[in-house]
Amino acid sequence: MVKVGINGFGRIGRIVLRNALQFQDIEVVAVNDPFIDLEYMAYMFKYDSVHGRFKGTVEVKNGSFVVDGRPMKVFAERDPAAIPWGSVGADYVVESTGVFTTIDKASAHLKGGAKKVVISAPSADAPMYVCGVNLDKYNPKDTIISNASCTTNCLATLAKVIHDNFGIVEGLMTTVHATTATQKTVDGPSHKDWRGGRGVGNNIIPSSTGAAKAVGKVIPSLNGKLTGLSMRVPTQDVSVVDLVVRLEKPASYEQIKEVMRKAAEGEYKGIIAYTDEDVVSTDFISDNNSCVFDAKAGIQLSPNFVKLIAWYDNEWGYSRRVCNLLQYVAKEDAKAGI
Protein backbone atom coordinates (compact mmCIF):
# COMPACT_ATOMS: atom_id res chain seq x y z
CA MET A 1 0.00 0.00 0.00
CA VAL A 2 1.37 3.40 -1.02
CA LYS A 3 0.49 5.96 1.66
CA VAL A 4 0.23 9.42 0.14
CA GLY A 5 -0.18 13.01 1.26
CA ILE A 6 -1.37 15.74 -1.10
CA ASN A 7 -0.08 19.30 -0.72
CA GLY A 8 -2.35 21.76 -2.51
CA PHE A 9 -6.00 20.93 -3.15
CA GLY A 10 -6.46 22.78 -6.43
CA ARG A 11 -7.40 21.26 -9.79
CA ILE A 12 -4.63 18.66 -9.85
CA GLY A 13 -4.71 17.91 -6.13
CA ARG A 14 -8.42 17.14 -6.20
CA ILE A 15 -8.27 15.10 -9.39
CA VAL A 16 -5.26 13.13 -8.18
CA LEU A 17 -7.41 12.18 -5.19
CA ARG A 18 -10.33 11.16 -7.43
CA ASN A 19 -7.97 8.95 -9.40
CA ALA A 20 -6.17 7.57 -6.35
CA LEU A 21 -9.47 6.33 -4.94
CA GLN A 22 -9.74 4.02 -7.96
CA PHE A 23 -6.51 2.19 -7.07
CA GLN A 24 -6.46 -0.52 -4.43
CA ASP A 25 -2.77 0.01 -3.67
CA ILE A 26 -2.88 3.79 -3.08
CA GLU A 27 -4.19 5.32 0.13
CA VAL A 28 -4.34 9.10 0.50
CA VAL A 29 -3.96 9.66 4.24
CA ALA A 30 -3.70 13.46 4.42
CA VAL A 31 -4.30 16.68 2.52
CA ASN A 32 -2.67 20.03 3.23
CA ASP A 33 -4.08 23.34 2.03
CA PRO A 34 -3.85 26.56 4.05
CA PHE A 35 -6.32 28.46 1.89
CA ILE A 36 -9.53 26.44 2.31
CA ASP A 37 -11.25 25.13 5.40
CA LEU A 38 -12.46 21.58 5.87
CA GLU A 39 -16.10 22.16 4.91
CA TYR A 40 -15.13 24.01 1.76
CA MET A 41 -12.62 21.29 0.90
CA ALA A 42 -15.41 18.72 0.99
CA TYR A 43 -17.64 20.92 -1.17
CA MET A 44 -14.93 21.51 -3.80
CA PHE A 45 -14.19 17.80 -4.01
CA LYS A 46 -17.83 16.77 -4.24
CA TYR A 47 -18.80 19.15 -7.05
CA ASP A 48 -16.74 19.65 -10.20
CA SER A 49 -17.81 21.73 -13.18
CA VAL A 50 -15.78 19.63 -15.63
CA HIS A 51 -15.69 16.07 -14.32
CA GLY A 52 -19.06 16.09 -12.63
CA ARG A 53 -20.29 15.33 -9.15
CA PHE A 54 -18.25 12.77 -7.21
CA LYS A 55 -20.21 9.53 -7.28
CA GLY A 56 -19.18 8.33 -3.82
CA THR A 57 -19.74 9.76 -0.35
CA VAL A 58 -18.05 12.91 0.91
CA GLU A 59 -18.29 13.81 4.61
CA VAL A 60 -16.64 15.83 7.34
CA LYS A 61 -16.29 13.82 10.56
CA ASN A 62 -14.35 14.54 13.74
CA GLY A 63 -12.04 17.00 12.01
CA SER A 64 -11.28 14.63 9.16
CA PHE A 65 -12.14 14.67 5.46
CA VAL A 66 -13.90 11.36 4.77
CA VAL A 67 -14.38 10.06 1.22
CA ASP A 68 -16.10 6.72 0.61
CA GLY A 69 -15.60 5.96 4.28
CA ARG A 70 -11.85 6.61 4.14
CA PRO A 71 -10.75 9.31 6.61
CA MET A 72 -7.98 11.73 5.66
CA LYS A 73 -6.25 14.08 8.04
CA VAL A 74 -6.39 17.72 6.97
CA PHE A 75 -3.60 20.21 7.62
CA ALA A 76 -3.47 23.94 6.88
CA GLU A 77 0.24 24.74 6.90
CA ARG A 78 1.79 27.36 4.62
CA ASP A 79 5.31 26.08 5.23
CA PRO A 80 5.86 22.57 3.78
CA ALA A 81 8.44 21.87 6.48
CA ALA A 82 5.72 22.25 9.13
CA ILE A 83 3.37 19.63 7.67
CA PRO A 84 3.57 16.53 9.93
CA TRP A 85 3.39 13.93 7.17
CA GLY A 86 5.17 11.39 9.33
CA SER A 87 2.44 11.52 11.98
CA VAL A 88 -0.06 10.03 9.53
CA GLY A 89 2.36 7.69 7.76
CA ALA A 90 2.46 9.61 4.47
CA ASP A 91 5.65 8.29 2.89
CA TYR A 92 4.99 9.92 -0.48
CA VAL A 93 3.83 13.50 -1.04
CA VAL A 94 2.22 14.85 -4.19
CA GLU A 95 3.36 18.46 -4.38
CA SER A 96 0.56 20.07 -6.35
CA THR A 97 0.61 23.72 -5.28
CA GLY A 98 2.64 24.76 -8.31
CA VAL A 99 4.89 26.71 -5.93
CA PHE A 100 7.46 24.25 -4.55
CA THR A 101 8.78 22.92 -7.86
CA THR A 102 12.54 22.79 -7.25
CA ILE A 103 14.52 20.23 -5.29
CA ASP A 104 15.37 22.79 -2.62
CA LYS A 105 11.79 23.95 -2.09
CA ALA A 106 10.16 20.52 -2.34
CA SER A 107 12.71 19.02 0.06
CA ALA A 108 10.97 20.89 2.88
CA HIS A 109 8.39 18.08 2.91
CA LEU A 110 11.08 15.64 4.04
CA LYS A 111 11.45 17.57 7.30
CA GLY A 112 7.89 16.62 8.20
CA GLY A 113 8.52 12.92 7.75
CA ALA A 114 7.85 12.30 4.05
CA LYS A 115 10.30 9.98 2.31
CA LYS A 116 9.73 11.10 -1.27
CA VAL A 117 8.06 13.97 -3.14
CA VAL A 118 6.44 13.80 -6.57
CA ILE A 119 6.07 17.28 -8.06
CA SER A 120 2.99 17.51 -10.28
CA ALA A 121 4.62 20.09 -12.55
CA PRO A 122 7.81 20.50 -14.55
CA SER A 123 10.91 21.14 -12.45
CA ALA A 124 14.02 23.12 -13.25
CA ASP A 125 16.30 20.65 -11.47
CA ALA A 126 14.41 17.57 -10.24
CA PRO A 127 14.54 14.43 -12.42
CA MET A 128 11.46 14.27 -14.65
CA TYR A 129 9.70 11.02 -15.45
CA VAL A 130 7.05 10.26 -18.05
CA CYS A 131 5.17 6.96 -17.80
CA GLY A 132 5.80 4.87 -20.88
CA VAL A 133 8.93 6.82 -21.78
CA ASN A 134 11.74 6.83 -19.22
CA LEU A 135 10.67 5.10 -16.01
CA ASP A 136 13.54 2.66 -16.51
CA LYS A 137 15.90 5.53 -15.65
CA TYR A 138 14.37 6.00 -12.19
CA ASN A 139 16.86 6.09 -9.32
CA PRO A 140 15.34 5.15 -5.94
CA LYS A 141 17.94 7.32 -4.21
CA ASP A 142 16.28 10.46 -5.60
CA THR A 143 13.96 11.93 -2.97
CA ILE A 144 12.44 14.64 -5.19
CA ILE A 145 11.10 13.78 -8.65
CA SER A 146 8.78 15.41 -11.17
CA ASN A 147 5.93 13.99 -13.25
CA ALA A 148 6.75 16.65 -15.90
CA SER A 149 3.78 18.50 -17.44
CA CYS A 150 0.52 17.33 -18.96
CA THR A 151 1.70 18.44 -22.40
CA THR A 152 5.08 16.73 -22.03
CA ASN A 153 3.29 13.51 -21.07
CA CYS A 154 1.26 13.66 -24.28
CA LEU A 155 4.04 14.83 -26.56
CA ALA A 156 6.81 12.60 -25.21
CA THR A 157 4.79 9.40 -25.61
CA LEU A 158 3.80 10.34 -29.16
CA ALA A 159 7.34 11.42 -30.05
CA LYS A 160 8.88 8.26 -28.58
CA VAL A 161 6.77 5.93 -30.71
CA ILE A 162 7.44 7.94 -33.86
CA HIS A 163 11.14 8.35 -33.11
CA ASP A 164 11.63 4.66 -32.29
CA ASN A 165 10.00 3.60 -35.55
CA PHE A 166 10.90 6.29 -38.08
CA GLY A 167 13.39 8.64 -36.44
CA ILE A 168 12.69 12.33 -35.85
CA VAL A 169 15.15 14.76 -37.47
CA GLU A 170 13.42 17.84 -36.02
CA GLY A 171 9.97 19.03 -35.11
CA LEU A 172 7.72 21.88 -34.05
CA MET A 173 4.85 21.47 -31.60
CA THR A 174 1.80 23.58 -30.89
CA THR A 175 -0.48 22.69 -28.02
CA VAL A 176 -3.97 24.13 -28.28
CA HIS A 177 -4.44 24.26 -24.54
CA ALA A 178 -7.51 24.60 -22.35
CA THR A 179 -7.75 27.35 -19.75
CA THR A 180 -5.88 26.87 -16.47
CA ALA A 181 -6.18 28.48 -13.05
CA THR A 182 -3.32 30.92 -13.58
CA GLN A 183 -5.24 32.76 -16.31
CA LYS A 184 -7.58 35.70 -15.79
CA THR A 185 -11.32 35.81 -16.38
CA VAL A 186 -11.08 39.47 -17.48
CA ASP A 187 -8.12 41.59 -18.60
CA GLY A 188 -5.73 42.20 -15.72
CA PRO A 189 -2.08 42.79 -14.86
CA SER A 190 0.41 40.10 -15.85
CA HIS A 191 3.80 41.78 -15.83
CA LYS A 192 5.88 38.84 -17.05
CA ASP A 193 3.45 37.81 -19.78
CA TRP A 194 1.35 40.68 -21.11
CA ARG A 195 -0.74 38.51 -23.41
CA GLY A 196 -1.32 36.08 -20.54
CA GLY A 197 -3.12 38.83 -18.66
CA ARG A 198 -5.92 39.04 -21.21
CA GLY A 199 -9.32 37.55 -20.42
CA VAL A 200 -9.69 33.84 -21.13
CA GLY A 201 -13.33 33.86 -22.19
CA ASN A 202 -13.02 35.72 -25.47
CA ASN A 203 -9.42 35.27 -26.60
CA ILE A 204 -7.03 32.81 -28.18
CA ILE A 205 -3.82 33.61 -26.32
CA PRO A 206 -0.36 32.69 -27.64
CA SER A 207 1.92 31.56 -24.84
CA SER A 208 5.26 29.93 -24.26
CA THR A 209 5.65 26.32 -23.16
CA GLY A 210 8.66 24.31 -22.14
CA ALA A 211 6.92 21.02 -22.94
CA ALA A 212 8.68 20.34 -26.23
CA LYS A 213 12.14 21.13 -24.89
CA ALA A 214 11.38 18.98 -21.83
CA VAL A 215 10.98 16.00 -24.16
CA GLY A 216 14.74 16.24 -24.69
CA LYS A 217 15.22 15.63 -20.97
CA VAL A 218 13.17 12.43 -20.93
CA ILE A 219 14.28 11.27 -24.41
CA PRO A 220 17.93 12.39 -24.67
CA SER A 221 18.19 11.43 -28.35
CA LEU A 222 15.61 14.15 -29.09
CA ASN A 223 17.40 16.85 -27.12
CA GLY A 224 17.55 20.03 -29.20
CA LYS A 225 15.33 18.57 -31.92
CA LEU A 226 11.94 19.80 -30.70
CA THR A 227 10.53 23.14 -29.62
CA GLY A 228 7.04 24.55 -29.44
CA LEU A 229 4.46 27.03 -28.26
CA SER A 230 1.01 27.07 -26.72
CA MET A 231 -2.28 28.61 -27.80
CA ARG A 232 -4.56 29.06 -24.79
CA VAL A 233 -8.21 28.77 -25.82
CA PRO A 234 -11.50 29.40 -23.96
CA THR A 235 -12.38 25.80 -23.11
CA GLN A 236 -12.37 24.39 -19.58
CA ASP A 237 -10.51 21.15 -20.14
CA VAL A 238 -8.88 18.88 -22.75
CA SER A 239 -6.02 20.04 -24.93
CA VAL A 240 -4.53 18.85 -28.20
CA VAL A 241 -0.96 18.51 -29.43
CA ASP A 242 -0.17 19.41 -33.05
CA LEU A 243 3.25 17.95 -33.84
CA VAL A 244 4.97 18.62 -37.17
CA VAL A 245 8.05 16.46 -37.73
CA ARG A 246 10.61 15.69 -40.36
CA LEU A 247 11.29 11.96 -40.40
CA GLU A 248 14.59 10.16 -40.97
CA LYS A 249 12.92 7.20 -42.65
CA PRO A 250 10.24 7.84 -45.27
CA ALA A 251 6.83 6.53 -44.31
CA SER A 252 3.28 6.65 -45.57
CA TYR A 253 0.60 8.04 -43.28
CA GLU A 254 -0.96 4.58 -43.25
CA GLN A 255 2.29 3.16 -41.87
CA ILE A 256 2.36 5.83 -39.16
CA LYS A 257 -1.24 5.08 -38.21
CA GLU A 258 -0.50 1.38 -37.97
CA VAL A 259 2.48 1.97 -35.70
CA MET A 260 0.38 4.18 -33.41
CA ARG A 261 -2.49 1.68 -33.39
CA LYS A 262 -0.18 -1.17 -32.41
CA ALA A 263 1.39 0.98 -29.68
CA ALA A 264 -2.04 1.77 -28.25
CA GLU A 265 -3.06 -1.89 -28.27
CA GLY A 266 0.26 -3.21 -26.98
CA GLU A 267 3.14 -1.78 -24.98
CA TYR A 268 1.51 1.61 -24.41
CA LYS A 269 -2.01 0.46 -23.63
CA GLY A 270 -3.49 2.71 -20.94
CA ILE A 271 -1.07 5.51 -21.82
CA ILE A 272 -1.67 5.92 -25.56
CA ALA A 273 -5.05 5.42 -27.21
CA TYR A 274 -6.02 5.46 -30.90
CA THR A 275 -9.11 6.88 -32.54
CA ASP A 276 -10.25 7.12 -36.15
CA GLU A 277 -13.63 8.63 -35.32
CA ASP A 278 -14.87 12.21 -35.81
CA VAL A 279 -14.08 13.38 -32.28
CA VAL A 280 -13.90 16.81 -30.62
CA SER A 281 -12.34 17.95 -27.37
CA THR A 282 -15.22 17.23 -24.97
CA ASP A 283 -15.14 13.59 -26.05
CA PHE A 284 -11.97 13.25 -23.99
CA ILE A 285 -13.09 14.72 -20.67
CA SER A 286 -11.97 12.34 -17.90
CA ASP A 287 -9.98 10.23 -20.36
CA ASN A 288 -7.30 8.18 -18.60
CA ASN A 289 -4.71 8.26 -21.39
CA SER A 290 -1.72 10.58 -21.70
CA CYS A 291 -2.12 10.74 -25.47
CA VAL A 292 -4.99 9.86 -27.82
CA PHE A 293 -3.72 9.70 -31.40
CA ASP A 294 -6.29 11.15 -33.81
CA ALA A 295 -5.79 9.19 -37.03
CA LYS A 296 -8.31 11.27 -39.00
CA ALA A 297 -6.87 14.66 -38.06
CA GLY A 298 -3.26 14.19 -39.15
CA ILE A 299 -1.95 15.17 -42.59
CA GLN A 300 1.13 14.45 -44.66
CA LEU A 301 2.96 16.60 -47.19
CA SER A 302 5.66 14.12 -48.19
CA PRO A 303 7.03 10.75 -46.99
CA ASN A 304 9.37 12.61 -44.61
CA PHE A 305 7.14 15.49 -43.49
CA VAL A 306 4.00 14.96 -41.44
CA LYS A 307 1.62 16.66 -39.00
CA LEU A 308 0.32 14.47 -36.16
CA ILE A 309 -2.57 15.25 -33.80
CA ALA A 310 -3.05 13.87 -30.28
CA TRP A 311 -5.62 14.73 -27.60
CA TYR A 312 -5.17 14.71 -23.84
CA ASP A 313 -7.23 15.59 -20.80
CA ASN A 314 -4.70 17.94 -19.24
CA GLU A 315 -6.30 17.48 -15.82
CA TRP A 316 -7.52 13.89 -15.60
CA GLY A 317 -5.03 12.02 -17.77
CA TYR A 318 -2.13 13.83 -16.13
CA SER A 319 -3.42 13.09 -12.62
CA ARG A 320 -3.76 9.44 -13.61
CA ARG A 321 -0.07 9.39 -14.48
CA VAL A 322 0.80 10.92 -11.10
CA CYS A 323 -0.86 7.89 -9.51
CA ASN A 324 0.90 5.49 -11.88
CA LEU A 325 4.24 7.12 -11.09
CA LEU A 326 3.55 6.73 -7.37
CA GLN A 327 2.82 3.04 -7.89
CA TYR A 328 5.99 2.52 -9.89
CA VAL A 329 8.38 4.35 -7.58
CA ALA A 330 6.92 2.66 -4.49
CA LYS A 331 7.61 -0.77 -6.02
CA GLU A 332 11.12 0.20 -7.06
CA ASP A 333 11.83 1.75 -3.67
CA ALA A 334 10.67 -1.45 -1.97
CA LYS A 335 13.01 -3.50 -4.17
CA ALA A 336 15.86 -1.17 -3.23
CA GLY A 337 15.01 -1.42 0.45
CA ILE A 338 14.12 2.26 0.70
From Swiss-Prot:
The keyword Cytoplasm applies. One of its GO terms (cellular component) is cytosol. D-glyceraldehyde 3-phosphate binds at S149, C150, T151, T180, T209, G210, R232. NAD(+) binds at R11, I12, D33, R78, N314. Gene3D superfamilies: Dihydrodipicolinate Reductase, domain 2, NAD(P)-binding Rossmann-like Domain. The active site is at C150 (nucleophile). GO terms for biological process: glucose metabolic process; glycolytic process. Signal peptide: none annotated. Pathway: Carbohydrate degradation; glycolysis; pyruvate from D-glyceraldehyde 3-phosphate: step 1/5. Keywords: Cytoplasm, Glycolysis, NAD, Oxidoreductase. It is found in: Cytoplasm. GO terms for molecular function: glyceraldehyde-3-phosphate dehydrogenase (NAD+) (phosphorylating) activity; NAD binding; NADP binding. SMART domains: Gp_dh_N. It catalyses: D-glyceraldehyde 3-phosphate + phosphate + NAD(+) = (2R)-3-phospho-glyceroyl phosphate + NADH + H(+). PROSITE patterns: GAPDH (PS00071). InterPro entries: GlycerAld/Erythrose_P_DH, GlycerAld_3-P_DH_AS, GlycerAld_3-P_DH_cat, GlycerAld_3-P_DH_NAD(P)-bd, Glyceraldehyde-3-P_DH_1, NAD(P)-bd_dom_sf. Its EC number is 1.2.1.12. It comes from the Eukaryota. Disulfide bonds: none annotated. Coiled coil: none annotated. It holds the Pfam family Gp_dh_N. The record marks H177 as: Activates thiol group during catalysis. PANTHER family: GLYCERALDEHYDE 3-PHOSPHATE DEHYDROGENASE, GLYCERALDEHYDE-3-PHOSPHATE DEHYDROGENASE-RELATED. Belongs to the glyceraldehyde-3-phosphate dehydrogenase family. Homotetramer. This is Glyceraldehyde-3-phosphate dehydrogenase 2. It comes from Agaricus bisporus.
